[in-house]
Amino acid sequence: MTLGAVASLILAIGGAAVFSALHKIEEGHVGVYYRGGALLTATSGPGFHLMLPFITTFKSVQTTLQTDEVKNVPCGTGGGVMIYFDRIEVVNYLVPSAVYGIVRNFTADYDKALIFNKVHHELNQFCSVHTLQDVYIGLFDQIDENLKLTLQEDLTSMAPGLIIQAVRVTKPNIPESIRRNYELMESERTKLLIAAQTQKVVEKEAETERKKAVIEAEKVAQVAEIKFGQKVMEKETEKKISQIEDSAYLARQKAKADAEFYSAQRAAEANKLKLTPEYLQLMKFKAIAANSKIYFGSEIPHMFMDSGPGSSSSAASKAIDVLSEGMLDLE
């Protein structure tokens, strides 16, 4: 063997050793190492790392969220009917500090022992104590939450650091004849719910109309009450105005009557003071003086009457007095 061949062999072995020693850990993973089949306590984070070639191996363990799918899980109900869950998804993640302990106890494929097998066991436990009606319809909406809580409770004691984030369970497959019956039953149930909701809507609309009618009636009653109150106030105002006008009219009439009475009283008092014997005598003389016919002679008293035979002077004097009184009345 030539020196060049030996050098090439050494370089090839060295290159293979370097290639075997250098490895990469992806982000979101933790590297665990085995030497001679024994798990080493050392772990590594993301990046490039070196290890002893040929005698040391590594495995990358994911610590971010991952979804484990458990497929075609058989489940026997309490009534003896066999059903199958097509797919159950378990969303979980591993705390990086717990990687070494979980890998040591359950290997790097820990999800098979802690998740897959546990899901099979818990589902069969659930189905065995419930009827098909409960599993398929009645309690189906609770299966995922109950399964999550049960898994997490067991993992907390068995493998602390493995966290169950969510569990999703698909509708189980049941025998075709039973499925058709359930579909018919669900259809009738849906129709019943629709009818019930329709009835509630009708009742709600009727109640709304009734409330609207009550509100409208109350509104009309309030408006009528307000108008009635306005009319009453108007009538009371008119009554007060009429009373005031009547009082004013009575006051005016009373004042007028009092004034007329006072005027008549004062005139009577004035006439009483005025009509003295002397004043009457004076007025008689004025009346005589105002007469345009004046007679001279001894027969003056006869100027007020016909000068017939047998007339006396006393009659003439009375006629003069009457004439004087008539003149006073004219004044």
UniProtKB/Swiss-Prot annotation:
Listed CDD domains: SPFH_like_u3
Residues spanning the membrane: 4-23
Cross-referenced InterPro entries: Band_7, Erlin1/2
GO cellular component, one term: endoplasmic reticulum membrane
Keywords: Cholesterol metabolism, Endoplasmic reticulum, Glycoprotein, Lipid metabolism, Membrane, Signal-anchor, Steroid metabolism, Sterol metabolism, Transmembrane, Transmembrane helix
Residues carrying covalently attached carbohydrate according to the record: N105
Protein localization: Endoplasmic reticulum membrane
Pfam families: Band_7
GO BP terms: cholesterol metabolic process; SREBP signaling pathway
Residues in compartment: Cytoplasmic: 1-3
Membrane topology: Single-pass type II membrane protein
GO terms for MF: cholesterol binding; ubiquitin protein ligase binding
Transmembrane in keyword set: yes
Task performed by this protein: Mediates the endoplasmic reticulum-associated degradation (ERAD) of inositol 1,4,5-trisphosphate receptors (IP3Rs). Promotes sterol-accelerated ERAD of HMGCR. Involved in regulation of cellular cholesterol homeostasis by regulation the SREBP signaling pathway.
Family label: Belongs to the band 7/mec-2 family.
UniProt-recorded name of the protein: Erlin-2
Species, as recorded: Danio rerio
